[in-house]
A protein has these predicted regions:
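Acidic, mature catalytic/reactive cores of soluble proteins
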Residues: 1-231
Length: 231
């Protein structure tokens, strides 16, 4: 039989293009014919584009793009689906936000809570997953300078609440403000204030040291690699 195309809207469209537009949307749609495709469709719902920038929403209905949640979830929402280009799109926006933060410039991007102490360490972890999915060489070429800048920012003690002590561990103060994933608050105060050598921060720190040291050594920067190995 013949197809009938019906369109209703608040503005005029060219009728002869309706079928072509519909078919293009159907082709772009993720089918719901398997458990994998249902997961893939759900993953795509967390992607958010605004003004040419790419973000990952922390959740629905009210969460925005939160830095820690973005870096933790980014590999699973992109690389696990063989969508390397989507990872790079989000990281392109994230890199600009990171550089604004470490250079103490006004935040011009809609990524919130960038100041939390472990965010940069999670960014390194996300890039480590990118290196596993693509190659260490590709990661070094595309993100090597960013990784080195993050490492120097931490090692030079420029973060306002992430302090590298002489024992090689990172210290953070969460007495008055929730700074970890355990971020519930009552009357503006953290329910579980965490201060000190927070275990996951230092696990991420050790991981970042080893990953970046190996990466830069493979790229010929033996001096920096030796410094990180001795950290």
């Amino acid at each position: 039989g013949e197809s009938i195309v019906f369109s209703a809207g608040t503005s005029e469209v060219t009728p002869r293009r309706l079928k072509q537009t519909f078919e293009a949307e159907v082709a772009d749609r993720t089918p719901r014919d398997s458990f994998y495709h249902c997961l893939k469709n759900s993953a795509h719902q967390f992607h958010n584009q605004q003004e040419g920038e790419h973000y990952i929403l922390a959740g629905y209905p009210w969460f925005k793009c939160r830095a820690r949640d973005m870096f933790i979830s980014l590999p699973g929402l992109t690389l696990a689906l063989d969508e390397v280009d989507q990872f790079e799109d989000v990281m392109k926006t994230a890199e600009k936000a990171i550089r604004s933060f470490i250079n103490d410039e006004p935040a011009g991007y809609k990524i919130y809570e960038m100041e939390h102490p472990d965010v940069l360490l999670w960014a390194v972890w996300a890039l480590q997953q990118y290196a596993k999915e693509t190659s260490r060489e590709q990661c070094r070429q595309k993100y090597g300078e960013l990784l080195k800048d993050i490492m120097e920012f931490i090692r030079q003690r420029r973060h306002e609440n992430l302090f590298l002590h002489d024992n090689g561990l990172l210290f953070a103060n969460g007495t008055d403000k929730a700074i970890t994933w355990m971020n519930s608050t009552v009357n503006g105060h953290p329910v579980i204030p965490r201060t000190g050598y927070i275990v996951e921060f230092n696990a991420l720190w050790y991981n970042a040291l080893r990953f970046i040291a190996d990466l830069v050594r493979e790229g010929g920067d033996v001096y920096l690699a030796d410094e990180l190995d001795a950290q």
